[in-house]
Each structure stands twice: as C-alpha cells, then as structure tokens.
Amino acid sequence: MVKAIKIDNLKYSYDERSLFSDFNLDIDAGQWVALVGHNGSGKSTLAKLILGLLVAEQGDIDVFDERLTVETVHHVRSKIGMVFQNPDNQFVGATVADDVAFGLENIQVESSEMPQKIDNALTIVGMQEFKNREPHTLSGGQKQRVALASVLALQPKIIILDEATAMLDPDGRATVMETLQKLKKQFGKELTLVTITHDMDEATLADRVVVINDGQKILDGTPAEVFSQRKALHENGLELPFANELAFHLNEKPNKYMDERELIQWLSTLNK
C-alpha cells in the first residue's frame, strides 16, 4: 500500500516543552483520517510539521515517498492543499473566481487554461453558480467550499483541513462535510483527506480516527473501534459522538416505570 504520509520517530519541542517524542504515523493513499484531540493536544502542530511550516528536531516525514527537507519542502507542499479554520482569512480575490485563480497564477498556469480549471473546481464543490459573487456575500459554509475549490484547482494529492468547520453554523458544517464525502467518493484513492477536529460527530465520517493528546497517539482505528473506548476518550478530554453518548446513557436508564414528565426530566439531565 502506497503511503501518502509516513512519520518516523518525530521529535518537536516548543518553548522547552516537548510536544512530540518518538511519534510515528502512517497514512495510506486514498484514506480519510480524522486527527482528533482537545485544544492544545498537538494536532494542528502536526499539520504544520507535515507542511514544513515548522521544522522537527529529529525524525523523518515522507510525503508520497519524498523526504521532507529544506531542499524538498516546496515540492512536498505542492502535493498538499490546506484549508484553515477561518474562511475570511483565506480570500484574496475580488470574486470567487478570482480567488480560485490566485493559486493557479502562483504555479504559473496558462491564462487560457484557467477558466476551465476554475469551473471544474467550483462545480465539484457545488459553487460554480457563485463564481462571480463577491466573497463577503457568501455564508461561512459557502466560503469554506470555495476554499476547497481553490485547493482542488491545484490538484493536490492530499488535503488537510484544520478545524475547517469550527467557526460554522450547523448548516454550514453539514454542507462542508457533505462536500468532503462527495470528494472521497469521486476521487477515491487519488485523494487523501486529513481532517483535524475536536468534533467527534465529524470524525465518524472518516475511514480512520487517530486520537492525539500531548503529542502522543492515544487511540488509532476505525470510528467503531475508537468510539468503543469511552473511558479512554473521556480521560483525554473528549466525548463520544452524540448518538453514541446518548445510547450509553440510555443503557443506564433507571429500571423502573416513569411517566412522561419523569422521563422528560431524566432525559434533560443527559445534556448537563
């Protein structure tokens, strides 16, 4: 199996605090991996290390068999697209189409080829009809889909989304996650997705969930395998996905008759 990302014996410290020590992680090409953990667990730092925005003290990072070094960092980055948390910080163009074109201009795509590439990328994420709109007129979810289109136009092998839905309302969050599912289905093994999140419901959509805390890999497996470890998740500051947490508490329902009012009162305690 081809490895999209391979991390061996990674060590990284910040302000004399060790964030990663002998950290190892392999991600197969075409896999959707959710990196989850509470704020400060190290997951966003890991993304910056993979992109070469931070430099590890020791260890190796390979992206599709290319070792990340000072000499190769720009070529490695060309294989990776990144979508960040705040959609407003990612727009540089006057219109949606201009924004998608910006990345293409940076890699010196011929101007005659740009319109087709822009239309293709916007169509994939369902934003083609908005291509002449000004970014400030879009919703948060629409802005993040445009950010995805800007990345897709560059044809990366890997897309990393760093808390890309954290600032969105439920509708915006849902549209972005639906778009990711569509990308997974459309591109298959040709596209590797890495979603960094603390939202467990989002993580259930991935092929694989990796739980990180204090720079250590705590759990690693399918969503079913990871979310069966309720105690370990709670010990690391995480909750189960809502449906799983509800199912757990329903199993603890008092074994006695309750009328409708009592049942409602008991259910209301589950949200505290």
Curated annotation (Swiss-Prot):
Keywords: ATP-binding, Cell membrane, Membrane, Nucleotide-binding, Translocase, Transport. It is found in: Cell membrane. This is Energy-coupling factor transporter ATP-binding protein EcfA1. One of its GO terms (cellular component) is ATP-binding cassette (ABC) transporter complex. Its main location: membrane. Disulfide bonds: none annotated. Belongs to the ABC transporter superfamily. Energy-coupling factor EcfA family. ATP-binding (A) component of a common energy-coupling factor (ECF) ABC-transporter complex. Unlike classic ABC transporters this ECF transporter provides the energy necessary to transport a number of different substrates including 5-formyltetrahydrofolate, pantothenate and riboflavin. Expression of the complex plus FolT in E.coli allows 5-formyltetrahydrofolate uptake; 5-formyltetrahydrofolate is not taken up in the absence of FolT or the EcfA1A2T complex. Gene3D superfamilies: P-loop containing nucleotide triphosphate hydrolases. PANTHER family: ENERGY-COUPLING FACTOR TRANSPORTER ATP-BINDING PROTEIN ECFA1 (PTHR43553:SF24), HEAVY METAL TRANSPORTER (PTHR43553). Its EC number is 7.-.-.-. Forms a stable energy-coupling factor (ECF) transporter complex probably composed of 2 membrane-embedded substrate-binding proteins (S component), 2 ATP-binding proteins (A component) and 2 transmembrane proteins (T component). This complex interacts with a number of substrate-specific components, including FolT, PanT and RibU for 5-formyltetrahydrofolate, pantothenate and riboflavin respectively. The keyword Membrane applies.
